[in-house]
Amino acid sequence: GNGMLAVTAGGPLPIHQDSSSFYNFGVGRNYIVGDKLVVIATDRAGNTSVAAFEQGEAMGNYVNLAAEKTILDPGETLTIRNTAENQYDMQIEWTNNNPEILEILESDGYSCTIRALAPGAASVSGGFGPYAKSLDITVRDPERERIAGQYPDIANHWAREEIITAIQEGLFRGTGANTFSPETALTQGQLVTVLHRLAGTPEATGSSFQDVVEGRYYTEAVAWAKETGLVKGVTPERFYPNSPVTREQFAAILYRYAQLQGQDVSNQADLSAYLDAGKLSHYAQSPMAWAVAEGLIRGVSETALCPKASATRAQAAVILVRYFTWEASQAA
């Protein structure tokens, strides 16, 4: 029940009445008293005591969260326990920082059972007031796992996660049933096809270029890109869909696409830190300055943009995922 007790720092004290300092506490609860954390605890023999801790004092002796694993599939449950070995059964409280990813099904002072709801990352904390420890939990995305398994040539690739996202969002497809070809140069046809998908595959009514034949994967996308002014062709008649896209061409086409979507493209970065900025074609100067300002395109180093170099499929996936995220943030 409730009792009168004196609080001093330095460890557990039995509940008792003291003439100099009185606090009325309920057993099984935690309190902040001045700069002390006061915890009501029950020892293994069932005796109720109070422990007072200095602010910032290590709580490792009283809280140690453990579970069989930390990576879950959606729908899977897991029990997290306080496994700290000491003479006191601390009644800790549990919290979850992302209820969209995890839910706490049940908990008591010693353990907590969670269920994975959706892919993502979350952490479960257990402790007393501000004195808590956390256990990070990852909920796997089965679709991302499937994509990663389907394209072994992106395993351990620096752009692996962005490539998976680009495929998952329907922007990119593989170059074969089991190949993505991340280091292959992106072609003009591939770029406009990806942007066409990003735009929701709108229909095109105008004529295309003479070298864009019917029935190719890029046919409708190129017609749409020409009709909207996204691309102008190498000549008015020829597009060269299988030619590689340079980094400055990529910036220019993405810039036009953003304008087509009604985005503000006025943000311009100072490119003087890049020693090869002078090699940018005139048409690509503002687009590249915008893309760098918004963090969509970064230099291949701190001093090099390499505007004339071909963009790889991996680089394109990264840039387009950044754009996808940026566009969503503009609408927020």
Where do the model's predicted regions map?
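Feature responds to low-complexity, polar/acidic, surface-exposed segments characteristic
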Residues: 59-62, 138-160, 168-169, 173-221, ...
